[in-house]
């Protein structure tokens, strides 16, 4: 697993051993960031939240492409260790915040985010629950983009969001949402 583009292009990312963490595949990340680039134009200055962060690959990719700051939300100890190691290895500590809390009950945001990534474990209903909790906690800024990765057999119809596009990549389904 590696950073795809930007200042840290080609830099490897550490991942915890075992099956507890399922990092977004490089191909799916490439597709996702292509979709986002066509809509956003640039990542410069954006504030990003990476929920169910795991290794932090999505938030770190956004930072590599110019995002101003990323907040990572994760509870798994092994994933947190890999995430913190990746942030340190890339020299991103000043542009990153790590919150060891549940992404499906994250509480109130200190500030709203322009771009949010959700990559919950497949098949547990966490995407819909997390989207509702994020909305309630004022995590998305007005007009924010939200990326949600699910398995191909999952669909989303979250209240308070509009689905911009859905794309299947391998075993993953990528949903791009906007705040209504």
Question: Residues of each region from the PLM?
Answer:
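Class I S-adenosyl-L-methionine-dependent methyltransferase catalytic core
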Residues: 1-180
